[in-house]
Curated annotation (Swiss-Prot):
Pfam families: dUTPase. It is an enzyme of class 3 (hydrolase). It comes from Cutibacterium acnes (strain DSM 16379 / KPA171202) (Propionibacterium acnes). Keywords: Hydrolase, Magnesium, Metal-binding, Nucleotide metabolism. This is Deoxyuridine 5'-triphosphate nucleotidohydrolase. Pathway: Pyrimidine metabolism; dUMP biosynthesis; dUMP from dCTP (dUTP route): step 2/2. Its cofactor is Mg(2+). This enzyme is involved in nucleotide metabolism: it produces dUMP, the immediate precursor of thymidine nucleotides and it decreases the intracellular concentration of dUTP so that uracil cannot be incorporated into DNA.
Length: 152
């Protein structure tokens, strides 16, 4: 794994951290207590600003544990942090649970920041595209089950 230096402005307790060696995402925390009613969304401050190097992007992803336990997700997941952005990273959280409110204490881990290299595509105009086996099929066109049916 290559190291990429990312200049970061944050109070020490808000500094993004990898929970385990080899993790792809560094945890982002909330600066203040957050209360979300069922179906409610809120822009949550992390107190973190980064200067991603040219050629890199940051993706702000939901944390699977919050989704599984509380139905908490990110409205625009993944959020995109471009290399030229210097503002605070905010996370647009949403409580998808139809019945239970969610409370997060200040300092709770709310999202993961994944930093990856960017490949800049060159979009070339053409009259048509090559045929493939999949063709124009989308939205479930490849089926649901990955397992072959079991004869009974």
């Amino acid at each position: 794994m290559a190291d990429v230096v990312v200049p970061t402005v944050a109070v020490p307790e808000a500094m993004p951290r990898y929970a385990m060696p080899g993790d792809a995402g560094a945890d982002l925390t909330c600066r203040h207590d957050v209360d979300l009613a069922p179906g409610e969304r809120a822009m949550v401050e992390t107190g973190v600003r980064v200067a991603l190097p040219d050629g890199y992007v940051g993706f702000v992803n939901p944390r699977s544990g919050l989704a599984a336990r509380h139905g908490l997700s990110i409205v625009n997941a993944p959020g995109t942090i471009d290399s030229g952005y210097r503002g605070q990273i905010n996370v647009l959280l949403v409580n998808t649970d139809p019945r239970e409110p969610v409370h997060l204490d200040a300092g709770s881990r709310i999202a993961q920041l994944v930093v990856v290299p960017v490949v800049e595509a060159i979009f070339e105009p053409v009259e048509d595209l090559d045929d493939t086996e999949r063709g124009q099929g989308g939205y479930g066109s490849t089926g649901v089950s990955a397992m072959p049916p079991v004869d009974g």
